[in-house]
Amino acid sequence: MAPNNGSWLVLSISMMLLSHGMIIIAKDQAIHHHDDDHDDMLINDHQMINDDDPYRTAYHFQSPKNWMNDPNGPMIYKGIYHLFYQYYPYDPVWHTEIVWGHSTSTDLINWTQQPIALSPSEPYDINGCWSGSITILPQNKPVILYTGINNKNYQVQNLALPKNLSDPYLKEWIKLPQNPLMAGTPTNNNNINASSFRDPSTAWQLSDGKWRVIVGTQQGKRGLAVLFTSDDFVKWNNTGNPLHSTEGNGIWECPDFFPVYVGKSLGADTSIIGDDVKHVLKLSLFDTQYEYYTIGRYDIEKDIYVPDEGSIESDLGLRYDYGKFYASKSFFDDETNRRILWGWVNESSIQADDIKKGWSGVQAIPRTVVLDKSGKQLVQWPLAEVDMLRENDVELPSQVIKGGSLVEISQITASQADVEISFKIPESNYVEELDSTCTNPQILCSQKGASIKGRFGPFGLLTLASMGLEEYTAVFFRIFKGPNKYVVLMCSDQTRSSLNPTTDKLSFGIFVDVDPINEDLSLRILIDHSIVESFSAKGKSCITARVYPTMAINDKAKLYVFNNGTEDVKITKLSAWSMKKAQINLSTDNTSNMSYNSNKVEKEEF
């Protein structure tokens, strides 16, 4: 528990007033305020998204329309799941004056739209309410720490509280009058660059009673997770030393720092410390738009994070996902003892196409995160709740797939599906040698795509395929022989995903830590119109792709097992399902424009 000093009393009193609905809102501070009716803060659906849009997802989280990016502050409160997200309600293109969208769910699959939680209104956030996190304080009190872009376009950190703690949906939030709580300087003389200082993490508390939080910044090209401490969650002190820093990769966005149990498939509360846990530091690299993580040790005496020996601290290191996946945020679900991960999946289309369809951005399916039994990497898997959308189960018997073969998986909706498949290869002396210079799996996948014959591989699945194979997104394995062991390459090849010449058609790849002789090679793929999420080796490696077929859409899409290698491979298991449509962000108001509300606490209330 934090000490009961004066500042903590301020926060405690404010929380008490909020819980009894006694806070006075400063209505005169609102901007773009059309009506005092709270429901007017809902997103205007007067111009609805086209229901026939072939790229609109059916069971992935999306905003009702327009622009969405980072997931913010996911949590569970009074049995209700909350997801906040970076949202621009007027345009499917990013703008700095962004707000916090908000949705709630009882199952993490079906979502109800809630009023905007935070919007620009005060000098400290007038140019945008950027990303942040939620921390659950003692007595189950959630608070938001977020980055505001102030009236000088500097980045500062602010606090917001729920207006009514008895409301499980937390529809209204109040900004603290002491904001901003953390700030840099234009001269960078406090080791914080005021123009690159953002995305506060979930806070954690140690036995000394102090709260700790990290914020991403940079010094030149050195990325830093600046560490702040507080006795009361209001007055924050820069410790002067970062939790961690690395030279050469620019600003660290959306830092996430959390413990993982060793030898347990359970999540851990963010403040857990002990001999049976390691720590994960995840960073999103603005310069490359990739993110990486390391696993290591948290030295609580020095308040520093030390990655395990051999860790690669760059975008060539370990990633949650080797495709389109950025600005991720995890939280601990204390009701199910899971750590759950959200991540933003950006478009691969040109801006003109985004404007035409009226929306941009998808959230990946939420995933559980645990430490692999090796202790060297994380394992991710779609939440078990996703399985409740499955229908029309199709099973294929164990069979050999000869080189050059193509087998259709029929009787499911191939544009909206979930498929699990496992392969087995025989031990052989006829395996391609891996060139010792081929150390980058993404480059290797681009050179050896699905159409390039090998020996063992490529074999896998052709998703979102047209009948004549003019279009398909291939997810496959290719086996090589390295100096001392077999090497398994997993690829997501989008080079033939669309006949539209303007879409980005990349190949993503990763070397999978699996023994192909003694273990099955498994894939699980979630297909949802314009997104293909692939999980291999039971979640050791993940690749997410955004694709926009012109022919393989809706009921015209096909799903195939293929083997374009010269050697036979065996399917040991194949199960596929159509996926039902989830209820996501159906509007509860269709009558009025969304308004921005300042949600500011009058100072004289304290």
Swiss-Prot record:
Record: active site: 70
Catalytic activity: Hydrolysis of terminal, non-reducing (2->6)-linked beta-D-fructofuranose residues in fructans
EC code(s) of this entry: 3.2.1.154
Glycosylated residue positions: 5, 110, 164, 193, 237, 346, 564, 585, 590, 593
Broad enzyme group: hydrolase
Coiled-coil regions, chain positions: none
Keyword Signal applies: yes
Listed Pfam families: Glyco_hydro_32C (PF08244), Glyco_hydro_32N (PF00251)
Gene Ontology molecular function terms on file: fructan beta-(2,6)-fructosidase activity
Database matches in SMART domains: Glyco_32 (SM00640)
Record's signal peptide: 1-21
Swiss-Prot/TrEMBL keywords: Disulfide bond, Glycoprotein, Glycosidase, Hydrolase, Signal
Activity control: Not inhibited by sucrose.
Annotated S-S bridges: 445-491
CDD domains: GH32_Fruct1-like (cd18624)
Temperature dependence: Optimum temperature is 30 degrees Celsius.
Glycoprotein recorded as keyword: yes
Recorded family membership: Belongs to the glycosyl hydrolase 32 family.
Function: Hydrolyzes levan-type beta-(2->6)-linked fructans to fructose, but not inulin-type beta-(2->1)-linked fructans.
Protein name: Fructan 6-exohydrolase
